[in-house]
């Protein structure tokens, strides 16, 4: 009988304990566990969102870098093209200047040749007059001398 009363006392104590735990502890513990579960789930979701955002940011950074490289390559290409154009313009300007100098030099040479011819004609005329004077052994007057010079110039 002692065993039965003790057993019944333990059962009653256990029942009170179950009721007490169920009434006062189980609800708050369950709520705490649910809140913790929710926080963990929210943390995992935030981590996943952060990972996704990081991947998007990396993708945007790669695209921006790629665009910058393309733009830089385009700028370099344009600069090289412009440099080639400048070189061609300089070559053309140098050729035009060379041609102008050549024409100027040719004109100057032509003028010098014409001056030399005129000087030579004058000398030839003087020599011819002197020769004619010696041949004729007489001096010609100025008008006759001038006519003789014109005739000699026409023949030369």
From Swiss-Prot:
* Membrane found in the keyword field: yes
Q: Any idea which GO molecular function terms this record carries? A: proton-transporting ATP synthase activity, rotational mechanism; proton-transporting ATPase activity, rotational mechanism
- Transmembrane portions of the chain: 1-21
Annotated localization: Cell inner membrane
GO CC terms of this entry = plasma membrane; proton-transporting ATP synthase complex
Source species, domain of life: Bacteria
List the keywords (alphabetical). Answer: ATP synthesis, Cell inner membrane, Cell membrane, CF(0), Hydrogen ion transport, Ion transport, Membrane, Transmembrane, Transmembrane helix, Transport
Per the similarity annotation, which family is this? Belongs to the ATPase B chain family.
**Role of this protein:** F(1)F(0) ATP synthase produces ATP from ADP in the presence of a proton or sodium gradient. F-type ATPases consist of two structural domains, F(1) containing the extramembraneous catalytic core and F(0) containing the membrane proton channel, linked together by a central stalk and a peripheral stalk. During catalysis, ATP synthesis in the catalytic domain of F(1) is coupled via a rotary mechanism of the central stalk subunits to proton translocation. Component of the F(0) channel, it forms part of the peripheral stalk, linking F(1) to F(0).
Q: What is this protein called?
A: ATP synthase subunit b
Organism, as annotated? Nitrosococcus oceani (strain ATCC 19707 / BCRC 17464 / JCM 30415 / NCIMB 11848 / C-107)
Organism taxonomic ancestry: Bacteria, Pseudomonadati, Pseudomonadota, Gammaproteobacteria, Chromatiales
